[in-house]
């Protein structure tokens, strides 16, 4: 689903992966959960890139991204968080916020998260029932930081 459609679904309450609304937009659990807690941050309103935001909105967006990372460190036990803003496929601003774990094989842990084979990435997809506790824990951890 495109970022535009996900933001529309988040606004209407029909996006099951929504963690919470934040000052700059929305946080959702990513479709891929091969790295537990992988989140996507989406601005609201949707804009083409970070450079299209005012300085104040840009600061808020990046601050929110760090808050999400702090929450993921608390909830998941990850040792580090990877942050990525690319927008090459879906050409609008959104951020990938990915917990990294010491239990990952070195060849993957020492690289970017998209180096995992597709079968590994597709093996654990977001599931409302399975991920509801994780979603709530992340929501609470973000909420206490806002």
Give the location of each predicted region.
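HIT superfamily nucleotide-processing domains
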Residues: 1-146
């Amino acid at each position: 689903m495109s970022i535009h459609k996900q933001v529309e679904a988040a606004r209407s309450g029909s996006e099951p992966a929504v963690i919470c609304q934040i000052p700059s937009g929305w946080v959702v659990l990513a479709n891929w959960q091969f790295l537990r807690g992988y989140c996507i941050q989406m601005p609201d309103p949707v804009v083409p890139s970070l450079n299209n935001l005012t300085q104040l909105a840009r600061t808020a967006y990046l601050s929110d991204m760090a808050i999400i990372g702090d929450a993921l460190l608390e909830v998941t036990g990850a040792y580090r968080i990877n942050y990525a803003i690319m927008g090459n496929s879906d050409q609008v601003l959104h951020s990938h916020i990915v917990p990294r774990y010491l239990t990952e094989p070195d060849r993957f842990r020492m690289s970017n998260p998209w180096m995992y084979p597709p079968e590994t990435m597709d093996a654990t997809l977001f599931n409302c029932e399975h991920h509801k506790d994780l979603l709530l824990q992340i929501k609470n951890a973000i909420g206490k930081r806002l």
